[in-house]
Amino acid sequence: MSERPKTLPPTLRDKKRYIAFKVISENQFNKDEIKEAIWNACLRTLGELGTAKAKPWLIKFDETTQTGIIRCDRNHVYDVIFSLTLVSDINGNKAIIKVLGVSGTIKRLKRKFLSQFGWR
């Protein structure tokens, strides 16, 4: 009786981009601290509506190399990058987020920007 709703074809889905980044700081941070810092930075610079449109989402974060991947909407990549560059501290500790690059797939992002940090 309860039928599953039809999924959207790939041509109608939102296009995504993946951003590789590295946290530069004297301290080590965990995934939750980075997620909160990214979210707060986007809310501060883009506002609630802009953040909702950009859809920033932390996909993966490696705590040993302090590198990670963020997914966002294709049309708002530079808005998210702008927000990340304005991060100056995380939980009261001085830190900056350096964007390594942008790609359309996670596989290509790892191969191109994160392979030097041991990502496979």
From Swiss-Prot:
Superkingdom of origin: Archaea
Main location: cytoplasm
Disulfide bond sites: none
Example GO molecular function: ribonuclease P activity
GO biological process, one term: tRNA 5'-leader removal
A GO cellular component entry from the record: cytoplasm
EC code(s) of this entry: 3.1.26.5
Keywords: Cytoplasm, Endonuclease, Hydrolase, Nuclease, tRNA processing
InterPro entries tied to this protein: Pop5/Rpp14/Rnp2-like, Rnp2-like_sf, Rnp2_archaea
Cellular compartments annotated: Cytoplasm
Reaction(s) catalysed by this chain's protein: Endonucleolytic cleavage of RNA, removing 5'-extranucleotides from tRNA precursor
Keyword Nuclease: yes
Subunit comment: Consists of a catalytic RNA component and at least 4-5 protein subunits. Forms a subcomplex with Rnp3 which stimulates the catalytic RNA.
NCBIfam families (UniProt xref): PRK03717.1 (NF002986)
Similarity remark: Belongs to the eukaryotic/archaeal RNase P protein component 2 family.
Function per UniProt: Part of ribonuclease P, a protein complex that generates mature tRNA molecules by cleaving their 5'-ends. The RNA is catalytic, but its KM for pre-tRNA is 170-fold decreased in the presence of the 4 known protein subunits (Rnp1-4). The protein subunits also decrease the amount of Mg(2+) needed for activity.
Protein name per its UniProtKB record: Ribonuclease P protein component 2
